[in-house]
Design a protein with these regions (language model features):
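Leloir-type glycosyltransferase catalytic cores
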Residues: 140-184, 357-408
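A donor-sugar binding/catalytic signature common to diverse glycosyltransferases
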Residues: 88-100, 313-359
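Catalytic donor nucleotide-activated moiety binding site of glycosyltransferases and closely related
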Residues: 267-313
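N-terminal subdomain of nucleotide-sugar transferases
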Residues: 1-49
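Structural motif
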Residues: 17, 87-88, 233-234, 276, ...
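Active-site and donor-binding regions of nucleotide-sugar-utilizing enzymes
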Residues: 26-30, 48-146, 335
Length: 408
């Protein structure tokens, strides 16, 4: 059987004229553009705000500033693609308003549509898929597909450790939002996918730092207790960023708050009496929202659960994955990390990895009593496929390894 061709190879081989829309904050799209040009490709870029310009300056040839309204972007993009014979559109994330319009235009004009995203297999990878990522992924969702592809997968060596943690990301974010905030007059009609207010972020980043220090010793002590096996059996609930597209678009809950309340209700009324529950706050959400008041309400209403429900912030998730008996998530990629540890996973949102053989297919109330494990053979095939096809070693906020052929 033929060896799987990595998506990065297909991206390079299948097109000549590329259009880059919004990339991740930072210099990655500039680096990607330069890499494509070494293969004599034509690369065009559209910037949407001054934060985009900060990392992909308009001085780079064939870079354009879109200063129109959102409802005019469809017409602008259709003409742009026709004028420049675009045969591939590349973006970061497929749920931003401009990118959703671009997907429709691409489909109508038979232009390939490529999406970068944070890694499915973290922390040392980023994702590249054709057609969409996460719930918009075009990949089949059944075990037989991945099992049938296993023989075609390349042998993948250990990745370089390129993820550098929070500080590089914070530095890049400050530069991006400072430029975007103070130069809004240039792009008066731009609609950001999140709040675009520098004062808002400064306040909440400071709050995040204070909370990190406040919870440090408490979380450290709790982590040691878990690592020593002193907490007993527990299920893990990793919360997601409150305004992430995975929450806003790829699930039916109104909010993370509503998701959490449903889990707490079910745990209290249906979980075995010996089971504990650990709710883990998302580290990127620390300064923005706090769910302590929700959890406290349930503990007050049901005093018997005060010592069975725990809310943590910065306990390293690998510690929790090594000891936990199950995970409940909306659709977080931490669910894939749990599967790597052979931890049963229930997804309550829409996730591309939610299918029989990998995740639990029953309901929430019955999951507390689940004794089954993910099928190791299925997960191994799933992981090998993505490493051979969709995952690229690197971090958007430090370095991404771009090479051709990729699997060498």
């Amino acid at each position: 059987m033929d060896v799987l061709k990595h998506n990065l190879d297909e991206l390079l081989e299948s097109s000549t004229n590329y259009l880059l829309l919004q990339g991740p904050i930072g210099p990655f799209f500039t680096e990607l553009s330069a890499w494509l040009k070494t293969f004599h490709k034509q690369v065009f870029k559209i910037n949407f705000n001054s934060g985009d310009e900060a990392f992909y300056p308009n001085s780079i040839p064939q870079t354009f500033a879109y200063q129109g309204q959102l409802d005019q972007f469809d017409q602008y993009l259709r003409f742009f693609c026709h004028q420049h014979s675009i045969d591939a559109i590349i973006c970061f994330g497929d749920t931003r308003a401009y990118h959703r319009i671009a997907k429709i235009v691409a489909d109508k004009q038979k232009i390939s549509f490529w999406v970068f995203e944070e890694g499915y297999l973290r922390p040392e990878y980023v994702t590249l898929e054709k057609g969409g990522v996460n719930d918009y992924s075009q990949l089949p969702r059944h075990a037989n597909f991945f099992l049938s592809q296993a023989a075609c997968c390349s042998e993948i060596s250990a990745p370089e450790k390129l993820a550098k943690g929070f500080i590089p990301l914070a530095t890049i974010a400050i530069k991006y939002y400072t430029k975007a905030y103070f130069n809004q007059d240039k792009y008066p009609d731009y609609q950001h996918h999140r709040i675009l207010d520098l004062k808002y972020y400064i306040k909440l980043w400071l709050t995040s730092g204070i909370k990190r220090a406040y919870y440090y010793w408490q979380d450290r002590s709790f982590g040691k207790k878990v690592a020593a096996g002193k907490l007993g059996d527990f299920f893990l609930v990793p919360l997601q960023v409150y305004d992430d597209s995975q929450v806003r678009i790829h699930c039916d809950y109104e909010s993370v708050d509503a998701f959490l309340k449903e889990i707490l209700e079910s745990f209290i009324h249906h979980a075995p009496s010996a089971l504990n529950l650990i709710i883990k706050h998302h580290p990127m959400d620390r300064g923005f929202v706090d769910y302590g008041h929700v959890i406290k309400q349930y503990k007050t209403q049901y005093p018997a659960f005060k010592k069975r429900i725990f809310y943590v912030h910065d306990v390293p998730i690998p510690i929790l994955l090594r000891k936990g008996k199950g995970m409940i998530t909306l659709n977080s990629t931490s669910g894939i990390s749990a599967l790597l540890h052979r931890m049963p996973v229930l997804t309550l949102g829409r996730a591309s990895y939610n299918f029989e053989g990998l995740t639990y297919q029953g309901n929430l109330h019955s999951f507390w009593h689940n004794k089954g494990l993910p099928e190791a053979k299925v997960f191994d095939a799933y992981r090998k496929y993505h490493l051979s096809k969709t995952q690229i070693n690197g971090s958007f906020y430090s370095k991404v390894i771009l090479r051709y052929p990729y699997n060498q």
